[in-house]
From Swiss-Prot:
Cofactor(s) needed for function: Mg(2+)
Name recorded for this polypeptide: tRNA dimethylallyltransferase
InterPro entries in the cross-refs: Dimethylallyltransferase, IPT, P-loop_NTPase
Source species: Lactobacillus delbrueckii subsp. bulgaricus (strain ATCC 11842 / DSM 20081 / BCRC 10696 / JCM 1002 / NBRC 13953 / NCIMB 11778 / NCTC 12712 / WDCM 00102 / Lb 14)
Family: Belongs to the IPP transferase family.
Length: 308
């Protein structure tokens, strides 16, 4: 089974720099595990590795697509797995670096994913009719009757997920929650998590936003705002939508910058919650441990010798 290392953690903790250091120590190449770094038109708000950093170590799935293209998690997984195969084919270590937990999870494990068209086709029309006639609450209650465990994990308002779960139950005759629990491992992976004191992370987030503003984030956000027609994924990215009220003349720039810092701190908290609940992570503190990168490199080398 192919060995893969993932380096995860909250925004601004230092994943990119540490991943590059580890890649240089252990002859690896990096696959971005970030849902927004794939887009070539946005660089500042997505905190991509710099051109100089990318020249040091080869990066995959950075600047690979336009914001005007549809790019689903399934597309990401397909391209990332291809990149892992390419890296392994060169005898190098594939290193996933990123903070989008669901994307990393989907990549490392055999999660059942479909593109938008496949997902739409997999929905039972009878449940769509039921939803239209009775609403999200009634739909969720039907799911709760048939599969309480699945219902616990799906918000009442998320009709799309309720539809999918009920459709799977109707089609297979089995519980949706049981099928989700049977997700298989795709790779032999080691997940390294970076984290530190909450206030230290929050301070780094605030500093990063200030540096992004100096680097031209406002103009990048203006580009996104001016192309907001449609359903482009980047419209929902933290770092851009917070400035929309400013461009619309509804809020001051200072207010929007503060909103971005707040949104980024909340996102960091959600990232940590996901990684702690969904993935087997070994945690390290790069902000207080000056030997962190060396300790991680030693741990990876030990793990590389293990058989699975």
């Amino acid at each position: 089974m192919q060995k893969v290392v993932a380096i995860v953690g909250p925004t601004a903790v230092g994943k990119t720099s540490l991943a590059i250091e580890i890649a240089k120590k252990l002859d690896g190449e990096i696959v971005s595990g970030d849902s927004m770094q794939i887009y070539k038109e946005v660089a500042i708000g997505t905190a991509k590795a710099s051109r100089e950093e990318q020249a040091e170590v080869k990066h995959y799935l950075v600047d690979a697509h336009s914001v005007f293209e549809d790019f689903s998690v399934k597309n990401f997984v397909d391209e990332a797995r291809s990149a892992i195969g390419e890296i392994a084919g060169k005898g190098k270590l594939p290193i996933i670096a990123g903070g989008t937990g669901f994307y990393v999870n989907a990549l490392l494990n055999d999660m059942q994913l479909g593109d938008k068209e496949e997902e739409a086709a997999s929905v039972d029309p009878e449940w769509e009719v039921f939803l239209a006639a009775n609403g999200p609450q009634a739909l969720w209650e039907e799911l709760n009757k048939k599969d309480p465990e699945a219902a616990k994990k799906i918000p009442v308002a998320n009709s799309r997920r309720s539809l999918r779960a009920l459709s799977v139950i109707s089609r297979t005759g089995g519980l949706f929650s049981k099928q989700q629990a049977e997700i298989k491992t795709r790779y032999d992976y080691l997940i390294i998590g970076l984290n530190s004191d909450r206030e230290a992370i929050y301070q780094r987030i605030n500093q990063r936003v200030d540096l992004m503003m100096e680097a031209g984030l406002l103009e990048e956000a203006r580009f996104v705002y001016e192309h907001r027609a449609g359903e482009h994924q980047v419209l929902q990215a933290i770092g851009y939508k917070e400035f929309f009220p400013y461009f619309a003349g509804e809020a001051s720039l200072e207010t929007c910058v503060m909103a971005l810092k707040t949104a980024s701190r909340r996102y960091a908290k959600r990232q940590l919650t996901y990684f702690r609940n969904k993935l087997p992570v070994e945690w390290y503190d790069p902000l207080t441990d000056p030997n962190c990168a060396n300790r991680i490199a030693v741990r990876i080398e030990e793990w590389m010798k293990e058989e699975k």
